Amino acid sequence: MSEVRVRENETLDSALRRFKRQCAMSGIMSEVRKREHYDKPSVKRKKKAEAARRKNAKK
């Protein structure tokens, strides 16, 4: 869980910006999106294979 304490003489906007950056760096939002809906194991395998195919095509 990301936690940001508002510093002395710090605006709420800058504290919110720090919090958002911290969440992005820790990968919280991507994890939430990934767990938002259940994916069957077969669908997970298909997505993984497609990602590998895209990665190899990029090279």
Curated annotation (Swiss-Prot):
This is Small ribosomal subunit protein bS21. Residues 43-59 have a biased composition (Basic residues). Residues 32-59 are annotated as: Disordered. One of its GO terms (cellular component) is ribonucleoprotein complex. It comes from the Bacteria. One of its GO terms (biological process) is translation. It comes from Clostridioides difficile (strain 630) (Peptoclostridium difficile). The gene is rpsU. Pfam families: Ribosomal_S21. Transmembrane segments: none annotated. Keywords: Ribonucleoprotein, Ribosomal protein.
